[in-house]
Every structure is written in C-alpha cells, then in structure tokens.
C-alpha cells in the first residue's frame, strides 16, 4: 500500500479514534478506529480497525496490527514495548501490548457487550465465546465495566519509586 494524500476519508462521527506516535527515525504508527464498520477490522484489504506502520521516507503503509475497535492511546517505552489503549463496546476497554502481525480480535472477540446506535453501520453479532479472545491476542488488561479509556503512558522514572514501570491510563469517566 502506498501513502495517499488522505489515508482514510471520514465515514462516521463514531469510533474514529486514533493516535499517532514516532516509532523510529523512518516510521510512525497510526492507530485507526473501525468508523462504525466493525467487519472491516478483520479485512486485510482495508485500513479500518488497524494500527498502521507508515514509512515517512518511501511513503509505504503496512498493517502493523489488526482487530481494533476504537483506539485511543499509544505509548512506546524505553525498551521498545508498544502499549495501546482502546474502547470496548459496552465495557471491555483494553490495554494491549502491540506486536507486529498480531490480531486483537475485534469484532469476533471482546470483553464488552453490544451497543445499540441508530446508525450502526455494518451489523455484528456478539461472538460465541463472549469475554474471550480464542485465536486472537489477549489484552494485557480488560476493564469489564467501561472506564472510557483514553491516552496511556508508562512511568519510567525513579522519582516516585512505587510507580516505577506502572502503566497509567486517562479516563473519560466511569
């Protein structure tokens, strides 16, 4: 895939979350929500519901991870571990460790339950194994009961020793 002027045209005002961070000197990571098109998160030909690795030198795009609903935060720690936070549907907000080629399951796997919207886009049904991630990458942590998760960071300093290497997530409310 090569980089167009606009990677994704707006298709919905819901579930279009995302974050952008610098991966290294040549690449950025861009997380993209499913824009109310849940089935596209598993479609390898589409960019919805993915974390994209974009090479800024040659303008190529590769799908880094897939199976995302509504990503909100990205953070790379000093060791190179990539953390992501993501809204679940009704509950099931996730903290994930992103690894190249991994699939986090949306919409076939979720720790949340189905939300009803007037315009829900592609319809999806709850997976047979609700509250599981069979055949998909499990989240590091799932909030069952939504916290409205947002940005994520890892505290890597020594000033507050009790918090060293702890993850912090922002919340839009309980």
Predicted stretch roles:
Residues 1-22:
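Asp-box/WD-like beta-propeller blade repeats and closely related beta-sheet repeat scaffolds
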Residues 22-25, 56-57:
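Alpha-helix capping at helix-to-loop junctions
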Residues 27-28, 82:
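Hydrophobic residues embedded in beta-strands of well-ordered beta-sheets
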Residues 34-174:
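Beta-propeller domain segments
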């Amino acid at each position: 895939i090569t980089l167009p002027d606009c990677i994704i045209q707006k298709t919905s005002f819901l579930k279009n979350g995302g974050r952008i961070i610098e991966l290294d000197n040549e690449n950025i990571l861009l997380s993209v929500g499913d824009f109310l098109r849940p089935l596209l998160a598993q479609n390898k030909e589409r960019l919805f519901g993915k974390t994209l690795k974009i090479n800024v030198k040659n303008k190529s795009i590769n799908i880094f991870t897939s199976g995302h609903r509504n990503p909100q935060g990205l953070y790379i720690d000093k060791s190179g571990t990539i953390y992501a936070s993501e809204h679940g549907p009704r509950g099931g907000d996730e903290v994930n460790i992103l690894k190249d080629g991994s699939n986090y399951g949306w919409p076939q796997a979720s720790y949340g339950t189905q939300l009803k919207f007037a315009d829900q886009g592609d319809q999806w049904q709850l997976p047979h194994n609700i509250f599981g991630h069979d055949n998909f990458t499990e989240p590091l942590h799932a909030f069952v009961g939504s916290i409205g998760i947002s940005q994520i960071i890892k505290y890597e300093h020594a000033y507050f020793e009790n918090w060293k290497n702890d993850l912090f997530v922002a919340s839009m409310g309980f």
